[in-house]
């Protein structure tokens, strides 16, 4: 139930150029490191064609990308993700993590998509809506629908967002993740709800179950 744009991984700028030519139109070249905030560090480039995509890959591949989540040493970019461009109407944030104080998984959504959620929490905390999930029942459809309404969605977009949230929760629990962030979560001009970017952390104590 988690919709994503089409895309492919590449390790060279020549591969990026070929993928961009295959996709046609606008593509997004994204550095593949395990950290958020890549856009601010120059690790995400929107490109109008194959030549721009190749140039972007030349700039990103091999760079030491520093973000607010990598620390000052940064991380070296060895691969990029080439993604089909989306017709974005509105951006949101959606995330799941364990609230250690309440000892419950908590679903969070915000209308402030594309921004660092830590900054939103610090400056405009009221723009983050949270739902503590009862572990005995898991995320319920009515809770997912309530979260969709909290984003100001209407009509079919509410149903699609609720379905997306149910799918994200299922992926989060079945993979024993400790964090799942979709930022941005996008409403397209066509009325679809898709994950344009994501970050997932897994519980290292549960890795043996997935070998």
State each model region's role.
Residues 5-7, 29-58, 93, 116-117, ...:
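Glycine-rich phosphate-binding loop of ATP-grasp-fold ATP-dependent ligases
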Residues 27, 31-33, 95-100, 107-112, ...:
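Short beta-strand elements
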Residues 70-132:
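Hydrophobic alpha-helical hairpins/lids featuring a short glycine-rich hinge
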Residues 116-157, 161:
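Cap/lid and interdomain-hinge subdomains that line or gate substrate/regulatory clefts
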Residues 143-185:
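A long amphipathic alpha-helix within ATP-dependent nucleotide-binding catalytic cores
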Residues 189-211:
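Acidic, glycine-rich loop-and-beta core segments that form the ion-binding/anion-interacting portion
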